[in-house]
């Protein structure tokens, strides 16, 4: 009996009514063969399982507030959104805008990812499997932003149910990358990133399960911040994988993200968070897995950022993380179990409503053993302990956001150096580990390739040290070619 027949038989035993899809399941499992092989070979550690716990964000110790220079014309932003319908950046634009509060984002237009409740707007998650039901209330994070004065001008397009990295949406169309139209905008928060990169809005809300804020930020040449796990409330936001999901700000630069983060924390004002220099800061540049392989132009950008950090007073040290190569396998088993469990009822009732790439990934989750999920959480605990130990030695980690700049539209595999990767692996290799650990991480726009494609770099810190991450990233941003352009 071959694998397809075995899976079909098992699916029938489970009561799954679509055993005829066994060939698609086998093909999808084949795409994850490297992760599955690595996971099987890894011994199960004698360690407790990882527990995703909320994080308290430490107060900033900065010298002054950054000036984000945010525009305040929401009506003009809505007009721009309608004019740029070719980008497919939005799933919904309202006929009229709701007035907001008079806080730190007074009058600032924002886009909200179509994965969360916005009162009076229809939530769809970008899927035909969701009826477009008008939200009766705001998600808590949206309510906080409205209290701070932000004006929601629309719902941003995304990869269906936030489960993918291309933002090629089966219901609302493929999001176009304004910075490089022949390249993917990243996902899953592709519409949020595109709306900022096109100058429609200065700020947007995204979610991040394996890089879904930081990857689109890097692809589109903007900034995207994934805060510490559960530092921000996820009430009123659809889950993908509960222990990996984060919500956070996206903006043109680090200063924008900091202003929006303050509003998301429900602070009355943007606190003093910036630094005069990087004196006394220890930066760990990660090698090994994080540099082999690496696109040549991404390496040049990383070298330049490392030099900039040192010239600004930072002490730069070189470090590796033992066992980091298992991060993708740990994430595969975690997200597959949690996402399939969340979608089980809807998938059974309306399977045809899902796009093929998301449907097959959710179906694949039925076939990964429960024991693998537990093993993954034990391995996750070990990995988190190692990275936490490193962040007691260094203040932040400095790495690229992706191994290479945004990939061409339609590409399913990526050749980087002498290695061939499935697209999702190539894109999330450097972002996914920090969803596993719940650590704050920001992708900042650094430079562009010879072809004009944006290159982003990532700064990562210890849980609760979100403002330190933002402050250090802001100093690096000031030295970047992007800032000088």
Stretches with model-predicted labels:
Residues 416-428, 432:
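Active-site-proximal gating segment of KS-fold condensing enzymes and close homologs
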Residues 14, 77, 90, 257, ...:
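Residue-level signal for inorganic ion chemistry
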Residues 201, 394-395:
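Short, high-confidence coil segments that cap the C-terminus of an alpha-helix
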Residues 73, 296-319, 344-349, 373-394, ...:
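Acyltransferase
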Residues 56-60, 64, 105-125, 280-282, ...:
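Short helix-loop capping/hinge segments that flank enzyme active sites or metal/cofactor-binding pockets
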Residues 143, 198, 202-291, 303-312, ...:
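Structural helix-boundary/capping segments
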Residues 3-134, 161-163, 485:
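Short, well-ordered alpha-helical
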Residues 84, 104-246, 288, 401-420:
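Short glycine/serine-rich loop/turn segments
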């Amino acid at each position: 009996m071959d694998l397809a027949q075995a899976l079909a038989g098992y699916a029938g035993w489970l009561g799954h009514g679509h055993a005829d899809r066994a060939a698609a399941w086998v093909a999808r499992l084949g795409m994850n063969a490297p992760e599955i092989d690595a996971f099987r070979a890894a011994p199960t550690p004698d360690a407790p399982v990882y527990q995703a716990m909320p994080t308290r964000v430490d107060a900033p110790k900065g010298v002054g507030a950054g000036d984000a220079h945010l525009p305040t014309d929401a009506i003009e932003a809505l007009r721009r959104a309608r004019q740029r319908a070719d980008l497919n950046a939005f799933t919904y634009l309202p006929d009229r805008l709701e007035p907001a509060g008079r806080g730190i984002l007074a009058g600032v237009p924002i886009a909200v990812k179509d994965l969360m409740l916005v009162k009076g707007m229809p939530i769809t998650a970008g899927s035909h499997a969701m009826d477009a039901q008008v939200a009766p209330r705001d998600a808590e994070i949206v309510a906080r932003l409205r209290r701070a004065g932000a004006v929601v001008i629309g719902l941003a397009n995304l990869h269906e149910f936030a489960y993918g990295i291309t933002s090629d949406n089966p219901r609302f169309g493929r999001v176009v990358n304004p910075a490089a139209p022949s390249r993917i905008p990243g996902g899953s928060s592709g519409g949020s990133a595109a709306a900022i990169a096109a100058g429609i809005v200065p700020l947007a809300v995204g979610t991040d399960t394996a890089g879904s804020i930081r990857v689109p930020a890097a692809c589109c040449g903007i900034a995207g911040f994934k805060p510490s796990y559960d530092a921000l409330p996820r009430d009123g936001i659809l889950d993908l994988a509960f222990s990996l999901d984060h919500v956070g700000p996206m903006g043109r630069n680090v200063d924008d993200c900091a202003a929006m983060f303050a509003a998301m924390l429900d602070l009355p004002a943007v606190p003093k968070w910036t630094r005069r220099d990087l004196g006394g800061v220890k930066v760990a540049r990660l090698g090994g897995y994080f540099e082999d392989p690496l696109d040549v132009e991404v390496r040049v950008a990383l070298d330049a950022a490392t030099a900039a950090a040192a010239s600004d007073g930072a002490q730069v040290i070189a470090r590796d993380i033992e066992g980091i190569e298992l991060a993708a396998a740990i994430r595969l088993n975690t997200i597959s179990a949690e996402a399939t469990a969340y979608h089980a009822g809807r998938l059974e009732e309306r399977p045809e409503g899902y796009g093929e790439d998301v449907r097959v990934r959710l179906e694949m989750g039925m076939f990964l053993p429960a024991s693998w999920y537990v093993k993954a959480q034990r391995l996750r605990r070990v990995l988190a302990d190692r990275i936490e130990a490193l962040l007691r030695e260094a203040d932040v980690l400095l790495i690229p956001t992706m191994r290479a700049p945004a990939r061409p539209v339609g590409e399913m595999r990526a050749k980087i150096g002498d290695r061939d990767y499935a697209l999702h692996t190539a894109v999330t290799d450097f972002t996914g580990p920090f969803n596993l650990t719940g650590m704050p991480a920001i992708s900042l726009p650094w430079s562009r390739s010879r072809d004009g494609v944006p290159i982003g770099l990532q700064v990562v810190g210890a849980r609760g040290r979100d403002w330190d991450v933002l402050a250090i990233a802001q100093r690096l941003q000031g030295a970047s070619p992007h800032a000088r352009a």
